Regions:
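Intrinsically disordered, low-complexity Ser/Thr/Pro/Gly-rich regulatory segments
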Residues: 1-81, 86-189
């Protein structure tokens, strides 16, 4: 096989991967838009599970995706319920977990995800963002470094915050709402 033929095969593989992702995107989008007019909360939970499945396919295995959890900080600040929490379960244990009730320390949280359908209540999303911003990591907590652990003063950053992600079906999201989030994922019909 000559070099040109080898390059063509590689390009074909990359094209197949791209097509598979486009197919997956279409399938996920169709699932997200399936309506269940009988019971709204059921549909919301269903959509959260779909978004969680998407993140589960792309995140490293060290992360756990929890649905319907609360974040707590060392000053006893507690968030409102968060649709999806992406956390490092190996780093910090749960504060409390029993059945579906989960309280997760802010230090373990890598990302928080707000899942919305086609109607977004701007006021509640702003409150959600403000609640997340209020939570603080403990100054004396153990900090992760690339492959080491440190406690106490070092040349590292003193605090982190979770990445904020909005997953929605609504295509008309205001700039004000977008500013609350680091990433916005919109499903297209």
């Amino acid at each position: 096989m000559d070099e040109k033929e080898s390059d063509n095969r590689k390009l074909k593989v990359v094209e197949n991967i791209r097509e598979n992702y486009q197919s997956l995107e279409g399938m996920i989008s169709k699932q997200l838009f399936m309506g269940n007019e009988l019971h709204g909360p059921t549909t919301g939970s269903f959509r959260e599970e779909i978004w969680a499945g998407l993140f589960g396919q792309i995140l490293p295995k060290k992360f756990v995706i929890e649905q319907s959890a609360f974040i707590i900080d060392s000053e006893e600040g507690i968030s409102k319920e968060i649709d999806l929490v992406i956390m490092d379960e190996m780093y910090t244990p749960y504060i409390f977990r029993y059945g579906k009730l989960k309280f997760i320390p802010i230090e373990a949280v890598a990302a928080v995800v707000e899942c919305k359908s086609q109607s977004i209540d701007e006021r509640s999303v702003k409150e959600w963002g403000a609640e997340i911003k209020k939570l603080r990591t403990a100054k004396e907590s153990v900090a992760r470094l690339a492959n080491m652990i440190t406690k106490g003063p070092t040349g590292t950053q003193l605090s982190t915050r979770p990445i904020r992600i909005l997953c929605a079906l609504d295509q008309n999201i205001s700039a004000e709402i977008k500013e609350i989030f680091d990433f916005v994922l919109l499903a297209a019909k």
